[in-house]
């Protein structure tokens, strides 16, 4: 069972990393970053259950990561909305805010 969950987590992490590297759209990049966070959370919960199922340290840490990821997504979407209002584009290569 452990191997299946780790393969799933590695697949999610790989898809998220590939999407983050190749994405030109900021929304897609944020979604891929969330995929990476979810893969890490799966690992936390899996290893916590595998090594010591009596303690919920991995699950508690995963809840903290989910809360931080939600805050990151909210701040990221707010920044993205401000960039779209100013630049009328959400492409990563067109979002150089140092030039006018």
UniProtKB/Swiss-Prot annotation:
Q: Which GO terms are recorded in the biological process aspect for this UniProt protein?
A: ATP synthesis coupled electron transport; photosynthesis, light reaction
- Show the Pfam families listed in the entry: Oxidored_q2 (PF00420)
Q: What is its main location?
A: plastid
Give a GO molecular function annotation for the protein.
Answer: quinone binding
Source species, domain of life: Eukaryota
Q: Which InterPro entries match?
A: NADH_UbQ_OxRdtase_chain4L/K, NUOK/Mnh_C1-like
Q: Membrane topology for this entry? A: Multi-pass membrane protein
Show the stretches that span the lipid bilayer.
1-21, 31-51, 60-80
Q: Decide whether keyword Membrane is in the record.
A: yes
Enzyme Commission number(s)? 7.1.1.-
Tell me which NCBIfam families the record gives: PRK05715.1-2, PRK05715.1-4, PRK05715.1-5
Q: What does this protein do?
A: NDH shuttles electrons from NAD(P)H:plastoquinone, via FMN and iron-sulfur (Fe-S) centers, to quinones in the photosynthetic chain and possibly in a chloroplast respiratory chain. The immediate electron acceptor for the enzyme in this species is believed to be plastoquinone. Couples the redox reaction to proton translocation, and thus conserves the redox energy in a proton gradient.
Write out the similarity annotation.
Belongs to the complex I subunit 4L family.
Protein known as: NAD(P)H-quinone oxidoreductase subunit 4L, chloroplastic
Native species: Trachelium caeruleum
């Amino acid at each position: 069972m452990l191997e299946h969950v780790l393969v799933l987590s590695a697949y999610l992490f790989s898809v998220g990393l590939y999407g983050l590297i190749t994405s030109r759209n900021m929304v897609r990049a944020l979604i891929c970053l969330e995929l990476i966070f979810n893969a890490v959370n799966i690992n936390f919960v899996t290893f916590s259950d595998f090594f010591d199922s009596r303690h919920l340290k991995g699950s508690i840490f995963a809840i903290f990561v989910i809360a931080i990821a939600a805050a990151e997504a909210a701040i990221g979407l707010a920044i993205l909305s401000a960039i779209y209002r100013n630049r009328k584009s959400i492409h990563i290569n067109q979002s150089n805010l140092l030039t006018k």
